[in-house]
């Protein structure tokens, strides 16, 4: 049975990197789909772990793709991180900022004094990503934390998709500081709850909506985080997470929906339905034969085949390493 996903939801919360754009380029057909959602009256908000850029700059980039977006339609991990800071240290405190101009702006707007050195005796450190973050920046953060400063990280993404490939993300830099100080930060961004809760409260107040659907390309941040707060999630295979990764997920990382591209948000969704020995989704059927997961009909590279295979694996009650999955389903 196929029906539109939108029968159950009234607004979309979407990741940006790997979903709408990759670096400076849009991911087709995201701009067209976002325009169509707008014409249907479906509000769209953006939730990003990128803390280095100002919301206005992101909105301008989206406008360059033909996507209309107000700066306050973007909730970032920098904004959420500052909200966490306010729970940890008094207003007006000195905060050592590791990250870009966008994060520094949020810290200043939050009523804190921005400093760059541990010698300024900051009450807290907030660590976000920027391409020019250096060893010296990380060292100053480590010195301040060792002296007793509270530590907030905007996000823990290990990698950052770029046009030329995958680059180290903020989580990699946070790990470097962790190695030096022997403790872990509070994390504001996905997959932690604060950013989802802030986004939900903001957009429901702004648009009068109640039922969100979260769209993302990363299982470890987008899908896991949405699941953690009880938000329906859809994985789009245009970014980081792969077919193999989604097949092997435990309960906390399993998306409710899987799509190959954003265009499928506007198409009837082929929900997997049980067959005698497996599941069928659209034109594909996958069966469980003992410990073997095998395609019996359809194109193994299709999203239908992946949906059916995931249904077989997820309901088998057998860990993925105990199953022999046909390689064509995930390669």
Please name every model-derived segment.
Residues 77-79:
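Polytopic endomembrane small-metabolite transporters, centered on the Drug/Metabolite Transporter
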